[in-house]
Amino acid sequence: MLEIKSIPAFNDNYIWLIQNSDKRCAVVDPGDAQPVLDYLQANELTLEAILVTHHHNDHIGGVPDLVRAFPHVTVVGPKAEPIPTLTTPMEEGDKLELFGEIFLVLGLPGHTLGHIGYVGDSKLFCGDVLFSAGCGRIFEGTPEQMFESLSKIAALPEETQVFCAHEYTASNVAFALAVEPDNEQLRQYRDDVNRLRALNIPTLPTTLRKEKWINPFLRTTNPDVVKSVANRIKNSDPCSVFTALREWKNEF
């Protein structure tokens, strides 16, 4: 059974560490090497793999130093993006074995064009595509691509744990409540999030089931969500609703 820990980095990043029972581990999106090296030393762990979702520096900045510290480490990442010291390029449909567990690679363009995610046994590492109560900004792709990527994630089993790369939950919930002020699950989640953050406890991972109740970007067919953007759209199809929500969030 794999154990997953969060290593905080920068102001709001999480570097996810995946550990097996014999002190071998992998990390996901190490934007900074030092907190990883400190954690590995403190817990006497050996780094065997680095998984990257996309090329932004706060996700790959620590890769070169980690490779220097662990020269035999495998660096897995998107085939279509410039990842330093990449050894194992991946794209949609590829599979990765990690400590006896198989992870399927999902192509998740939108935030960046080559963004990928890794889905294993009831767990998803999705970088900057899906956040709790929110989604990533569209820097390189199109709204249509981002909508399709989120739809791909939404089709996964609802018990899937979602390991996002940023602690954006509180600000995302504030926007979600602007969209759906009468959503009781969302109000309760706001209170839960505030309690956790007051204690400096991560709000992540989340679950896909929870996100379908509280995340407006996964609720684009909900009548209240559609109504909230009625003055911003000509068509009420889900992709148009998503696009309007994302534009609204950019201004929020």
From Swiss-Prot:
Name what cofactor the protein needs: Zn(2+)
UniProt superkingdom? Bacteria
The UniProt record lists the EC number as 3.1.2.6
The record's annotation in SMART domains points to: Lactamase_B (SM00849)
Cofactor note text: Binds 2 Zn(2+) ions per subunit.
Organism of this sequence: Vibrio parahaemolyticus serotype O3:K6 (strain RIMD 2210633)
Pathway assignment reads: Secondary metabolite metabolism; methylglyoxal degradation; (R)-lactate from methylglyoxal: step 2/2
Q: Which reaction does it catalyse?
A: an S-(2-hydroxyacyl)glutathione + H2O = a 2-hydroxy carboxylate + glutathione + H(+)
> What does the sequence similarity comment in the record state about its family?
Belongs to the metallo-beta-lactamase superfamily. Glyoxalase II family.
- Which residues are recorded as binding Zn(2+) 1? H54, H56, H111, D128
A biological process from GO: methylglyoxal catabolic process to D-lactate via S-lactoyl-glutathione
What's in the keyword line of the UniProt record? Answer: Hydrolase, Metal-binding, Zinc
Q: Which GO terms describe its molecular function?
A: hydroxyacylglutathione hydrolase activity; metal ion binding
Instruction: Write out the function statement from the record.
Output: Thiolesterase that catalyzes the hydrolysis of S-D-lactoyl-glutathione to form glutathione and D-lactic acid.
Name assigned to this protein: Hydroxyacylglutathione hydrolase
Subunit and interaction comment: Monomer.
* Annotated binding of Zn(2+) 2, by residue: D58, H59, D128, H166
